[in-house]
């Protein structure tokens, strides 16, 4: 993947999702979605954060591109793109931005399987992967039971399997998170390449340090990243207009 490919997708996503809104309407939706994630996180387990057309557009055209750029930087910093994976499971895939960042960085891009509960997000994920000429298919449902059941055919060859969870574990309740950690640790021990990406904010992911302790004890690594902010012009203009000050692209990761 070239930088131009990623920028072309970002420009296309912005054009695709802002055309039905005035500038002020779109920016209002961006701010509202940010507030939902930052100030009203307690609602996430009970109510979808993208429960309106405006919020869905804001996620697809603003937050997903930022996730893409951050994930791509983390993938390269960790060398994840050098792993010889043939299948990439994107759990809680949203619009497919995170798996697109990883898969399009690989010399031989893997086939993607994206799992999410939201049908509109899955449709957007399929569109995203097409923009990068990636092979991808979607499954609608909760990714925790998927990993324990329907995913079994993909788990038979763990050494060629990648699993990514980008900004999705923080939306689970405590018991499902605990079950997921056990499952991911087992798959990583069997040879799967597992990448978890979460926000820098400890308030957003207060469980992360406990996960990191367990992950490191099983041979993985935990990192905190602050990458130089290199938003393309179209995304930078939206960020500034929305009133966000952004000097770096940050995330915490678990990798094995």
Where are these regions (language model features)?
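N-terminal auxiliary segments of SAM/dcSAM-dependent transferases
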Residues: 1-46
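Class I SAM-dependent methyltransferase Rossmann-like catalytic core
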Residues: 45-74
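Conserved SAM-binding loop of SAM-dependent methyltransferases across substrates and taxa
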Residues: 95-108
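Conserved beta-strand signature within the Rossmann-like core of class I S-adenosyl-L-methionine
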Residues: 190-199
